Amino acid sequence: MGIQGPVLLLLLLCVMLGKPGSREESQAADLKSTDIKLLSMPCGRRNDTRSRIVGGIESMQGRWPWQASLRLKKSHRCGGSLLSRRWVLTAAHCFRKYLDPEKWTVQLGQLTSKPSYWNRKAYSGRYRVKDIIVNSEDKLKSHDLALLRLASSVTYNKDIQPVCVQPSTFTSQHQPRCWVTGWGVLQEDLKPLPPPYHLREVQVSILNNSRCQELFEIFSLHHLITKDVFCAGAEDGSADTCSGDSGGPLVCNMDGLWYQIGIVSWGIGCGRPNLPGIYTNVSHYYNWIETMMILNGAVRRDLALPLLSITLLQAPWLLRPT
């Protein structure tokens, strides 16, 4: 073949180096330090507000600046949390019937779930959703988390800030200073949140999974308590979440920063003794969150396909008899 053989091998080598898998890896490496900033600072910071007592009470403006209201056709549907200027974390079951991103908006920076029509500040903190990414790694398990990619970049201020996220090596158990927030109903009988529909907060304790499995064994649901979820609340039922809180964050204070540990997922009733709420374990899905943000953070042309086309077109000439 003369010199044509080495040329062909060189082109084929270029194709292999440019294959889609390696493109994703190089994309991940490039974007980790630019578009994603999942662990970048500052995060998990909030206004200095006086601590409140435990037990399902109204919150204060700016106390949980990462809190998001996911709105379906202009009405609050689920909670969520701001991870970065373009990404919101929430529960997958919120989109069981409504996966069209055009039907959703995300409200940030508001204490109420029903801001006044004349509240211009509320509209400046409302963002359209570009993509809804639901975790579907294993259909046999819940994997109850989803990412929303916003159509435009969020403007940070004192009332809008991202929450921190811990990597997969983090353990959520034995965290004493944890809170969950939401606009859900107040009781199991669906007693609605009264005007002015302010965000509520409650301090919760995280149970170890073996204890949680014991509590849910009576309903034959103990097999659902695996490493991708955890239980939190109060065993006497005094601290819990309910309908409308789904997708909202459970956060813990560590060294002065707030980290999201869980996502409100499911439970049996609301506030029942010995039946704590079930939360998606965020750190368990850290790698999935990071990967989805990287792969959807920026779209680059895949050079492997046109390069492969050139190689194949030139192959007959390169291999022709000399």
From Swiss-Prot:
Q: Which PROSITE patterns match?
A: TRYPSIN_DOM, TRYPSIN_HIS, TRYPSIN_SER
Biological process (GO) annotations held by this record are: proteolysis
Keyword terms of this UniProt record:
Cell membrane, Disulfide bond, Glycoprotein, GPI-anchor, Hydrolase, Lipoprotein, Membrane, Protease, Serine protease, Signal
The topology of this chain with respect to the membrane is: Lipid-anchor; GPI-anchor
| Residues covalently joined to lipid (GPI-anchor amidated asparagine) | N296
Question: What single Pfam family name could you report for this chain, choosing any that match?
Answer: Trypsin
Q: Which domain of life is it from?
A: Eukaryota
Tissue expr = Testis-specific. Expressed in spermatogonia and spermatocytes. Expressed in Leydig and Sertoli cells (at protein level). Expressed 2 weeks after birth and remains highly expressed in the sexually mature testis. Expressed in the seminiferous tubules but not in the interstitial tissues. Expressed in type B spermatogonia and spermatocytes at stages between preleptotene and pachytene during the spermatogenesis cycle.
Proregion positions: 20-52, 297-322
Could you describe the post-translational modifications of this protein?
A: N-glycosylated.
One GO location term (cellular component)? side of membrane
Entry annotation: catalytic residues: H93, D144, S246
Q: Which residues form the Peptidase S1 domain?
A: 53-294
UniProt EC number: 3.4.21.-
- SMART domains tied to this protein: Tryp_SPc
Q: Where in the cell is it found?
A: Cell membrane
List the InterPro entries: Peptidase_S1_PA, Peptidase_S1_PA_chymotrypsin, Peptidase_S1A, Trypsin_dom, TRYPSIN_HIS, TRYPSIN_SER
Positions of glycan attachment: N47
What are the boundaries of the signal sequence?
A: 1-19
Q: What class of enzyme is it?
A: hydrolase
Q: Which cysteines are joined by disulfide bonds?
A: C78-C94, C178-C252, C212-C231, C242-C270
* GO MF annotation, one: serine-type endopeptidase activity
UniProt record similarity statement:
Belongs to the peptidase S1 family.
Provide the protein name: Serine protease 41
